[in-house]
Curated annotation (Swiss-Prot):
This is Co-chaperonin GroES. Keywords: Chaperone, Cytoplasm. One of its GO terms (molecular function) is ATP binding. GO terms for biological process: chaperone cofactor-dependent protein refolding. Its main location: cytoplasm. It is found in: Cytoplasm. It comes from the Bacteria. Heptamer of 7 subunits arranged in a ring. Interacts with the chaperonin GroEL. Transmembrane segments: none annotated. One of its GO terms (cellular component) is cytoplasm. It comes from Ehrlichia chaffeensis (strain ATCC CRL-10679 / Arkansas). The keyword Iron does not apply.
């Protein structure tokens, strides 16, 4: 991965749920967005009022859960990712 995240940004590869057994096909705009993903890149963190960096609690390889409408989708090397702030992540697998 040749993409360096800045500040407290996290790059996530969404883990899709496969529910193809239903005969009803919904348009993409009506489908529920994924809320689980694998972290592929993290920024260094943000600076506090004293000028010290607050390190990230999320690391590359973590499987995380995030808010449904969190982040922005980007495409990098023909693959889709979600970029979000660390604060949009609500849990990680232990």
């Amino acid at each position: 991965m040749n993409l360096n995240m800045l500040h407290d940004n996290v790059l996530i590869e969404a883990l899709e749920e496969c529910n193809s057994s239903s005969p009803i096909q919904l348009p993409d705009s009506a489908k529920k967005k994924p809320t689980q993903g694998k972290v592929v890149a993290v920024g260094p963190g943000v600076y506090n009022h004293s000028g010290n960096i607050l390190p990230m609690t999320i690391k590359v390889g973590d499987v995380v859960f995030y808010r449904q409408w969190a982040g922005n989708e980007i495409e990098f090397h023909d693959k889709k990712y979600i970029v979000m702030k660390e604060s949009d992540i609500i849990a990680k697998e232990a």
